[in-house]
């Protein structure tokens, strides 16, 4: 089997898949990523590409992302031509096409089976955009998003099959394309994610927090409204007043992964710290953490708060569940798919800081009900194992079409 894996930030979601495939006898696994892609330790099949130029600053605002996608597609196609000229012709191309890399893949490798990871299809209503009245969208936002969907529509038209991690993400795509889209999560390391009664972590200020301590955890790639950071901070202010011994470990960077940058502060962390009054001795911002330290955070957690707009589900929620954390999640569509209220965690209204604080305080107190939820969360997370993800993607590589609406076997 000859496979070409494409991701702007390779390996992205495909790391564990590439690692497994590259070890198989007779498999030739190559990859494409931007020159800024981190690569995969122990894997030397990555070919980097570089954009010919940046998008023009004078480009129409609605078209800037499309011009960027065209430049990515051009650069990736040139890299694919080099692979072809050196004798590599893939049987399958697996790609995250969200930046435009596969726009011209079929022009280079017309006989390859093109499989797209279709992570998201934007809509101006009914999901992330316009969800939070605190940040209303403009007509220009709506028009820009509609134009940007031209890329995602082309991607769905061009591919032979598509896959998405959750039923919620699949449901966001136009109905005409749903028969093409299967559901399969890539998988998390459930073998390496487990509770640890002896886990401990030392904060930057020197405080040592251990499993069993009243520790609230919050994790996001970046601290921003899409992941409910503003609401969490308001809830934390209430929590610290109610529970005088609780500590909060807040993991995430100060950049923006989704949505817009804050206008009246350097970043969302500074903006929210100016709004709420927190005890700095009990509030621990870690920034982004190495994997081992991140795991310790989940293992010392007495209550893990996960909030998100109706958007892509974070791996961190599933990883917290695999560690047996007590989950307090927003009652939004992607979270409902992973967490059952009263069984594997508690669902709370996204915007209700008072209710979030109340339920989190209950989780800190523990008890038999929360112990049962933690155990059930860990058991449920096994459904998202790396083994299940690999089996599903193996089937997708050779299937004539994905199974619709169910995890790919």
Language model features with spans:
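Nucleotide-activated donor-binding/catalytic signature segment of Leloir-type glycosyltransferases, i.e.
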Residues: 256, 261-288, 292
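N-terminal subdomain of nucleotide-sugar transferases
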Residues: 1-44, 163-165, 408-409
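A short, well-ordered alpha-helix in the C-terminal region of glycosyltransferases
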Residues: 369-383
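Conserved acidic donor-binding segment of nucleotide-sugar-dependent glycosyltransferases
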Residues: 341-342, 346-353, 362-367
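Short hydrophobic beta-strand element within catalytic cores of glycosyltransferases
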Residues: 326-329, 339
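Conserved donor-binding/catalytic core segment of Leloir-type glycosyltransferases
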Residues: 204-227, 233-238, 249
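Aromatic "clamp/platform" in nucleotide-sugar-dependent glycosyltransferases that forms part
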Residues: 309
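Acceptor-binding helix/loop patch of EC 2.4 sugar-transfer enzymes
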Residues: 53-63, 111-150, 191-200, 254-265
């Amino acid at each position: 089997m000859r496979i070409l894996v494409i991701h702007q930030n390779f390996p992205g979601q495909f790391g564990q898949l590439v690692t497994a495939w590259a070890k198989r006898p007779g498999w030739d696994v190559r990859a494409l990523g931007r020159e800024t892609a981190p690569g995969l330790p122990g894997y030397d099949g990555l070919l980097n590409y570089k954009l010919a130029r940046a998008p023009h600053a004078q480009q129409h605002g609605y078209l800037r992302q499309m011009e960027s996608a065209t430049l990515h597609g051009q650069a990736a196609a040139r890299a694919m031509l080099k692979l072809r000229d050196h004798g590599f012709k893939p049987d399958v191309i697996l790609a995250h096409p969200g930046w435009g890399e596969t726009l011209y893949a079929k022009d280079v490798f017309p006989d390859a089976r093109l499989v797209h990871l279709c992570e998201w299809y934007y809509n101006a209503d009914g999901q992330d955009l316009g969800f939070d009245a605190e940040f209303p969208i403009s007509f220009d936002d709506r028009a820009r998003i509609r134009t940007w969907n031209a890329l995602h529509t082309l991607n769905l038209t061009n591919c032979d099959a598509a896959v998405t991690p959750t039923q919620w993400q699949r449901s966001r795509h136009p109905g005409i394309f749903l028969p093409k889209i299967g559901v399969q999560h890539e998988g998390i390391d459930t073998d390496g994610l487990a509770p640890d009664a002896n886990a401990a972590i030392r904060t930057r200020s020197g405080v040592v927090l251990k499993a069993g301590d009243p520790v609230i955890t919050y994790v996001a790639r970046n601290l921003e409204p899409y992941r409910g950071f503003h609401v969490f901070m308001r809830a934390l202010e209430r929590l610290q007043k109610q529970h005088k011994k609780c500590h909060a470990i807040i993991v995430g960077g100060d950049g923006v992964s989704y949505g817009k940058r804050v206008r009246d502060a350097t970043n969302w962390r500074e903006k929210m710290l100016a709004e709420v009054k927190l005890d700095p001795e009990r509030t621990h911002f870690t920034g982004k953490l190495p994997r081992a330290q991140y795991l310790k955070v989940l293992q010392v957690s007495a209550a893990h708060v996960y909030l998100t707009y109706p958007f892509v589900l974070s791996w961190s929620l599933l990883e917290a569940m695999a560690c047996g954390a007590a989950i307090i999640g927003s009652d939004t569509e992607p979270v409902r798919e992973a967490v059952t209220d009263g069984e594997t965690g508690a669902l709370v209204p996204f915007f209700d800081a008072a209710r979030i604080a109340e339920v989190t305080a209950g989780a800190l107190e523990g008890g038999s009900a929360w112990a049962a939820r933690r155990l059930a969360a860990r058991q449920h997370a096994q459904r998202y194992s790396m083994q299940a993800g690999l089996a599903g993607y193996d089937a997708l590589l050779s299937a004539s079409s994905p199974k619709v609406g169910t995890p790919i076997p």
